[in-house]
């Protein structure tokens, strides 16, 4: 009887934890299929990345040049830290601020989603398409 209660307790605990795993998956700021098909917001983030020519400092694959490798940085930075860096810059390190850029302020969520997807290895480098 005690074994049955123990197993039932374990099953209950695992069932209670399962929704937490689903929530974590739902917290992903992007949707991607096949490595290059992404949701509309993430696609706008990629377009913003390209329009601002961010690859001049961070590399075409976000692996860094004179600027840091964003595929590593976005593994550590929270969305709030990323937003703060984009809007305020890091002048001491050569990172300009973009708080006056309408393109950035309107697409900051998409830019974060794109770079986070790259850092997570879910989004492949190169041209993206909209996920339909």
Describe these PLM feature segments:
Residues 19-20:
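N-terminal signal peptide c-region/cleavage motif recognized by signal peptidases
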Residues 35-47, 56-97:
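Gly/Gly-Pro-rich "capping" loops immediately C-terminal to redox-active cysteine motifs
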Residues 25-41, 51-52, 93-132:
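Flexible coil segments in periplasmic/lumen-exposed cytochrome c-class electron-transfer proteins
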Residues 1, 24-25:
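N-terminal flexible/basic segments that precede or flank functional cores
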Residues 1-10:
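Bacterial N-terminal signal peptides that target proteins for export
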Residues 8, 55, 64, 77, ...:
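A broad, structure-centric signal for solvent-exposed, well-ordered loop/edge residues
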Residues 5-6, 53, 91:
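Short hydrophobic/aromatic segments of transmembrane alpha-helices and their interfaces
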